[in-house]
Amino acid sequence: MADTLGKSELEVIKPQKREIRKGQVRKHIITVKVRNEMGVLARIATLIAGKGYNIEGLSVGETHEKGISRMTIEVIGDDIVIEQVVKQLRRLIDTLKVSDLTDVPHVERELALIKVYTPSSRARDEVLRITEIFRGKVVDVSPDTYTIEVTGDEDKINAMIELLKPFGIKEMARTGKVAMRREMSIKEEENE
């Protein structure tokens, strides 16, 4: 299926309108829509590493379109070099759409699973209270631990982790961000 896509079916993205300040280093959130082919992730990671940057976060998953995946990549870097990376990503053969969401309105979320020690009823009650405040949920229970699932933005997850640290975090798994441009942002761009 992916090999049958023609150039006319690929989305063309207008360059983002933003002021690029030389030397400014900050976190960028880049989304990449790709054909779900072997080696695509490796080529993208190599391109970014080749510019001297580490991928801080990465989420990849299928989209509603058969044979198409979406990547959300977090990378900290200089605006000018990241702009070059975005342009080079657009040229990769299996890349269909690339967007730097850093300076446009967007929604981002991540998920964390946090296994916390709960050796007493008091600890269990307090961990449950914190979980409810953050709208998380307990997804696994053992005699000495609760495993909590929480979703939200980076600040929310970091705040919950800080509150759970005094109980002792036994284990934690955290996804990279998933991000999507806000609909109003897309419509505004189309009207320009």
Swiss-Prot record:
GO CC annotation, single: cytosol
UniProt-listed GO biological process terms: isoleucine biosynthetic process; L-valine biosynthetic process
A GO MF term: acetolactate synthase regulator activity
EC top class, as a word: transferase
Domain ACT: 29-103
Pathway(s) annotated for this protein in UniProt: Amino-acid biosynthesis; L-isoleucine biosynthesis; L-isoleucine from 2-oxobutanoate: step 1/4; Amino-acid biosynthesis; L-valine biosynthesis; L-valine from pyruvate: step 1/4
Known EC number: 2.2.1.6
Reaction it catalyzes: 2 pyruvate + H(+) = (2S)-2-acetolactate + CO2
Alphabetical keyword list: Amino-acid biosynthesis, Branched-chain amino acid biosynthesis, Transferase
InterPro entries linked: Acetalactate_synth_ssu, Acetolactate_synth/TF_NikR_C, Acetolactate_synth_ssu_C, ACT-like_dom_sf, ACT_dom, AHAS_ACT, AHAS_small-like_ACT
Assembly notes: Dimer of large and small chains.
PANTHER family reported in the protein's UniProt record: ACETOLACTATE SYNTHASE SMALL SUBUNIT, ACETOLACTATE SYNTHASE SMALL SUBUNIT 1, CHLOROPLASTIC
Entry's family note: Belongs to the acetolactate synthase small subunit family.
Protein name: Acetolactate synthase small subunit
Organism: Aquifex aeolicus (strain VF5)
